[in-house]
């Protein structure tokens, strides 16, 4: 065995052992990061929601606005603590949200759908009724844009609140149900509209600070009562502004509005100078939702739900089992064909194929790649393409053996002649994968993107295993199997080369016939 072949074999053994270790069930700590299987929506179950931006004032949102909204939605979704959520733009005014493994779909929808515009407004000498609508200096409660749009029916429970530090008496508020994106077609909006005095809608209230002025917000518990609250801390500039306002308006009312609906209207008993406060009267889930909305910022464009689809985990597990079964049957059939047709090289290709599968699956866990049914299909297709590369190599190998070359020379020449075809076909496939990945990212087609990513990874690894692993294994086998019987190399008796000296060659004349 040549020294280079020995070194290559050692490298393959180490690589295979590492890949198998990563592939073992469970999570592995590799280079400071966790390597684990990330299942997509269709495998572990979850929620898929299609959101559409509302055309306010009859104007469609710009691309920059949609990207800003997508980033805010992504921040809110990431705060849910889910594994590999997907938030993608689809077309010019839609956003696709995929939440694998979400436990409470309704709570998740409330988290990212609401605009989350939190306003602290000057209510003056009269408290505003909880659950009513207000016009503020940041915009009216009713616009032409939301009058012409259909509303979703998913309401957001909205809490009563008290924007006071611990020293300030808390107002006694009752939580009310408030739609996060109220529109006139929504029954909850109609209820809030009917409860709103007409003179209140004719007035514009001054917004003192907004949720964007809050530096941090978190769900918490009142140390005295043990009730859930949202604790917040204002940014330095806003804290000074808030302190000046509360100092000048002691005895008056400061209302809090979420998406133009009043959720609290406490009286200012003392100046609030420390820039800290709490929002009370919330449930545990409502506190979490409101804190996420405050931290991520408000949406510049309201969003409506076009469709939502919940995938059960049972369906996902059944799909996984069927996909694995189909893949094993397909790989087994291919392995049997390779061994029967190519014999010893076919057996070597099966070993290389097993190494290929181990390396690819390890990469899926290390990157990580979110596995979906389409992604599994892409992986199975890449297995077929890996076998196709071996078929090309072995066909060239048999051609060289038929021409009477020795085994070592036939292997070298066979791989050299097969490489251009393997390279060109795989590059064409990778270009197609790049187009599919772009298409999936641009139009929110995560299924297509997942298929293309797994296929591309498989194709890249297949070029390595076909050229490097298979060639090394063949050279190792050749050094161990000392036989001149070409049958085990896939050459039948009727395909053997003619014995040397038995072939007829045309005679070459060195003389020139002259007329």
Curated annotation (Swiss-Prot):
Which organism does this record belong to? Answer: Thermobaculum terrenum (strain ATCC BAA-798 / CCMEE 7001 / YNP1)
Biased region (Low complexity) positions are 150-169
Question: By its UniProt entry, which Gene3D superfamilies does this protein fall under?
Answer: 3.30.1360.200, 3.30.70.3400, Multidrug efflux transporter AcrB transmembrane domain
Q: What does this protein do?
A: Part of the Sec protein translocase complex. Interacts with the SecYEG preprotein conducting channel. SecDF uses the proton motive force (PMF) to complete protein translocation after the ATP-dependent function of SecA.
Q: Which Pfam families match?
A: SecD_1st, SecD_SecF_C, SecDF_P1_head
List the residue ranges of the region (Disordered). Answer: 141-186
Which residues lie in coiled coils?
none
The organism's taxonomy opens as: Bacteria, Bacillati, Chloroflexota, Chloroflexia, Candidatus Thermobaculales
Q: Where are the transmembrane segments?
A: 6-26, 322-342, 344-364, 367-387, 427-447, 450-470
Q: Keyword annotations for this protein?
A: Cell membrane, Membrane, Protein transport, Translocation, Transmembrane, Transmembrane helix, Transport
Q: Which GO terms describe its cellular component?
A: plasma membrane
Query: GO terms for molecular function, please?
Result: protein-transporting ATPase activity
What protein does this entry describe?
A: Protein translocase subunit SecD
Specify the superkingdom: Bacteria
Composition-biased stretches (Polar residues): 170-186
Q: Where in the cell is it found?
A: Cell membrane
Q: How does it assemble?
A: Forms a complex with SecF. Part of the essential Sec protein translocation apparatus which comprises SecA, SecYEG and auxiliary proteins SecDF. Other proteins may also be involved.
Membrane topology per record: Multi-pass membrane protein
- Tell me one GO biological process term: protein transport by the Sec complex
Q: What's the family?
A: Belongs to the SecD/SecF family. SecD subfamily.
